[in-house]
């Protein structure tokens, strides 16, 4: 019957696959699990995408199946039907289609050869297989892949007679830490932007720009004052060095720190910068002056003694401090300090006094009793000071600073307050150019 129907009994031979397609599986003959149609002598109709009636499930054929030879003679055309419902004369194996996407129409001319199946589903490897012992330089036409695990892929042009896999090629994801050798271009400066050569730059330009700003000057002054305050708080001994200098030079007629430090702090507070030093001067009166006149006399004698001894020049501004006791009311005695500023250069002479500190009558009477009647300086005061009497009679009291024990305010603070007022009056009387 096969001879009468005009169908050749010899099955078509499958030509060897092209050398460019490496991963294509060997074609299956009519003995495969799916039937295959044979050419019909009738006319060839065009293969169009519309010939599919429903999506066809994909059948993945692996390249590990050996070629299978047919042991059954080919069947007549009438007994063979395409499982895909194709209207064309060529039955395409279902393994050739991995998705319902439509392929390109085939030519209406005579076919060049049997239709070959497409490569299996998966990422395009172009002959590359991730397996041990495989040479990674194979299949790259002599080119070195970018990384050992990610070879470079090239899309080959479709060959006639080969049905390509229309599935979208997805990149390999997960499990591979691949570092890309891609380098990015460096930023290039815009040649249209030219720097202003006239504008000052750097730290010096910034300082010149803000030097004339009054607000910045005020902030800098406050910052400087804060830094100086912090330094002097942490180390009070640094104050004379930080604020020393300027046009104000004062000599104190004593080498005792309680007097020199108080006058220095006061003048530096008023003038900002002031050089204050101490020189021991002689009062030439009794150790404990009594009365205002004796106090003023003792302070002035200290100044004159330094000038006579040429310790200071004749126009040197001098500040002298002398403490005395006075009976302001009957049987009510007070300790007072006298401060004198003498500046012969500008003809300035100022006198001021500290606050009065009460002294008990019994302590004054004891100091009087300890002074001999024939004491030669009895006209100016007493031989024994009030501080010495308090030191003998009151425990934990020093003769040099007994004011702290009786008033809570040290003698230095009392002298500082009076010296600050003295410096303020002196500043007002000085010419403006000097200030």
Curated annotation (Swiss-Prot):
SUPFAM superfamilies linked to this entry: ITPase-like (SSF52972)
Places the protein is found: Golgi apparatus; Cytoplasm
Record-level GO BP terms: epithelial structure maintenance; somite specification
Primary location group: Golgi
Tissue-wise expression: Expressed in the brain, heart, testis and ovary.
Alphabetical list of InterPro entries matching this protein: ITPase-like_fam (IPR029001), NTPase/PRRC1 (IPR026533), PRRC1 (IPR026534)
GO molecular function, one term: protein kinase A regulatory subunit binding
Start-end of Pro residues biased regions: 12-28
Polar residues bias spans: 30-45, 144-157
Loss of function: phenotype: Knockdown of prrc1 results in small eyes and severe somite defects in embryos.
Required for interaction with PRKAR1A as annotated region, ranges: 296-389
Region (Disordered): 1-54, 101-165
Keyword field: Cytoplasm, Golgi apparatus
Gene3D superfamilies reported in the protein's UniProt record: 3.90.950.10
Any Gene Ontology CC annotation: Golgi apparatus
Family classification: Belongs to the PRRC1 family.
Quaternary structure, from the entry: Interacts with PRKAR1A; resulting in PKA activation.
Function noted in UniProt: Acts as a regulator of the protein kinase A (PKA) during embryonic development.
Protein name: Protein PRRC1
């Amino acid at each position: 019957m096969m001879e009468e129907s005009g169908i050749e009994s010899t099955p078509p031979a499958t030509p060897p696959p092209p050398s460019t397609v490496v991963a294509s599986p060997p074609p299956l003959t009519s003995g495969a699990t799916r039937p295959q149609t044979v050419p019909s002598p009738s006319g060839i109709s065009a293969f169009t995408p519309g010939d599919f009636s429903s999506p066809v499930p994909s059948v993945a054929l692996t390249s590990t199946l050996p070629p299978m030879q047919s042991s059954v003679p080919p069947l007549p055309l009438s007994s063979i039907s395409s499982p895909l419902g194709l209207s064309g004369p060529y039955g395409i194996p279902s393994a050739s289609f991995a998705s319902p996407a439509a392929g390109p129409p085939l030519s209406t001319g005579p076919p060049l050869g049997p239709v070959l199946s497409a490569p299996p589903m998966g990422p395009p490897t172009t002959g590359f297989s991730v397996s041990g012992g495989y040479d990674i330089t194979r299949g790259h036409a002599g080119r070195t892949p970018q990384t050992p695990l990610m070879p470079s892929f090239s899309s080959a042009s479709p060959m006639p007679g080969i049905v390509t896999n229309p599935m979208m090629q997805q990149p390999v994801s997960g499990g591979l830490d691949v570092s890309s050798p891609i380098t990015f271009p460096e930023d290039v400066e815009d040649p249209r932007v030219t720097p202003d050569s006239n504008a000052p730059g750097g730290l010096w330009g910034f300082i010149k720009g803000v030097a004339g700003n009054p607000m910045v000057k005020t902030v800098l002054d406050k910052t400087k004052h804060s830094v100086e305050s912090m330094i002097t708080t942490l180390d009070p001994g640094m104050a004379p060095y930080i604020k020393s200098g300027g046009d104000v030079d004062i000599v104190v007629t004593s080498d005792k720190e309680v007097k020199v430090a108080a006058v220095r702090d006061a003048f530096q507070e008023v003038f900002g910068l002031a050089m204050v030093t101490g020189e021991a001067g002689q009062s030439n009166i009794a150790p404990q002056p009594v009365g205002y006149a004796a106090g003023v006399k003792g302070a002035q004698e200290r100044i004159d003694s330094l000038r006579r001894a040429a310790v200071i020049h004749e126009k040197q501004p001098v500040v002298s401090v002398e403490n005395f006791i006075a009976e302001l009311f009957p049987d009510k005695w007070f300790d007072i300090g006298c401060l004198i500023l003498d500046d012969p250069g500008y003809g300035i002479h100022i006198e001021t006094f500290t606050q009065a500190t009460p002294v008990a009558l019994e302590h004054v009477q004891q100091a009087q009793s300890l002074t001999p009647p024939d004491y030669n300086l009895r006209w100016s005061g007493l031989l024994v000071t009030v501080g010495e009497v308090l030191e003998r009679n009151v425990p934990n009291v020093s003769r040099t600073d007994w004011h702290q024990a009786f008033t809570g305010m040290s003698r230095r603070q009392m002298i500082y307050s009076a010296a600050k007022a003295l410096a303020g009056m002196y500043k007002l009387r000085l010419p403006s150019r000097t200030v």
